[in-house]
């Protein structure tokens, strides 16, 4: 990742975990879902992935581990986290104690058919280009058992040129993404757009706001948090203008034979 994304997913992740740890356990999951882990999105994916208690679920680009912890609490899956940034790995281990491997999504260090299911939330656009995005999808297919499912949250370019996109992001079009999915030997079985994400419950919102207030009280003057806030603002503006769209997709790995 380049500088702006490293600030958000490494340094700020580490700081966010410190804040959540000081505020208490009820803040851990909302704080660690900072970014793409909205409850409505996670609930939709869990409904369509149909995980069962005890199944192994790989979270690729897991960040601080909030979505994986949410899934484990709701469904009883056993999460395995894969995350490239050391600060986010430390945050996930500190808050949830889940197994986490520092690794790139284009070269997952797991054997073929290791897990029952996986998800990858808002990560595809952080790859440095189309070849890396195809590699990520290929790795997801490789590590999931035949007949298993993969959940994606993806941000897609709805226009040829984006106005002032966040640095380091590469947004495929919907057509490009679905071509990549087919080339990886995967099948999209469920697709939905999230133009207007349902507002989280009030207690969730309150905890997120408390974490943000304390994060900015402690670190608001730092260049790392300023950069992360700027990246988030650019992202939000593109979504609001319709230049970017959010999709949730469930993919199926073909059954053996």
For each of these PLM feature ranges, what is it?
Residues 151-170:
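Short, glycine-/aromatic-enriched active-site segment of Class I SAM-dependent methyltransferases
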Residues 56-107:
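Class I SAM-dependent methyltransferase SAM/SAH-binding core
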Residues 35-53:
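Conserved alpha-helix/loop element of class I SAM-dependent methyltransferases that forms part
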Residues 194-242:
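C-terminal helical/coil "lid" or tail adjacent to the Rossmann-like core of SAM-dependent
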Residues 1-26:
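N-terminal, positively charged/glycine-rich alpha-helical extensions of SAM-dependent methyltransferases
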Residues 134-149:
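A short glycine-rich, Lys/Arg-flanked "PGG" loop and its adjoining helix->strand segment in the class I
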Residues 119:
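A conserved beta-strand element that flanks and buttresses the S-adenosyl-L-methionine
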């Amino acid at each position: 990742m380049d500088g702006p994304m490293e600030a958000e997913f490494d340094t700020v992740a580490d700081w966010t975990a410190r804040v959540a740890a000081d505020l208490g356990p009820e803040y851990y999951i909302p704080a660690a879902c900072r970014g793409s882990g909205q409850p409505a999105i996670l609930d939709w994916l869990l409904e369509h992935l149909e995980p069962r208690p005890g199944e192994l679920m790989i979270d690729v680009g897991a960040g601080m581990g909030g979505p994986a912890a949410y899934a484990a609490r709701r469904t009883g899956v056993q999460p395995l986290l894969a995350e490239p940034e050391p600060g986010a790995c430390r945050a996930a281990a500190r808050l949830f104690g889940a197994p986490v491997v520092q690794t790139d999504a284009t070269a997952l260090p797991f054997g073929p058919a290791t897990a029952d299911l996986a998800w990858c939330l808002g990560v595809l656009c952080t790859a440095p280009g189309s070849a890396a995005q195809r590699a990520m999808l290929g790795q997801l297919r490789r590590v999931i058992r035949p007949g298993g499912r993969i959940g994606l949250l993806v941000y897609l370019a709805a226009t040829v040129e984006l106005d002032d996109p966040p640095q380091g992001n590469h947004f495929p079009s919907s057509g490009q993404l679905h071509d990549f999915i087919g080339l990886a030997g995967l099948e999209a079985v469920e697709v939905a757009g999230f133009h207007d994400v349902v507002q989280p419950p009030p207690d969730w919102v309150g905890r997120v706001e408390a974490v943000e207030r304390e994060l900015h009280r402690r670190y608001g003057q730092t260049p790392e948090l300023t950069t992360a806030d700027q990246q988030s603002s650019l992202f939000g503006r593109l979504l609001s203008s319709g230049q970017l769209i959010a999709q949730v997709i469930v993919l199926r790995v073909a059954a053996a034979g």
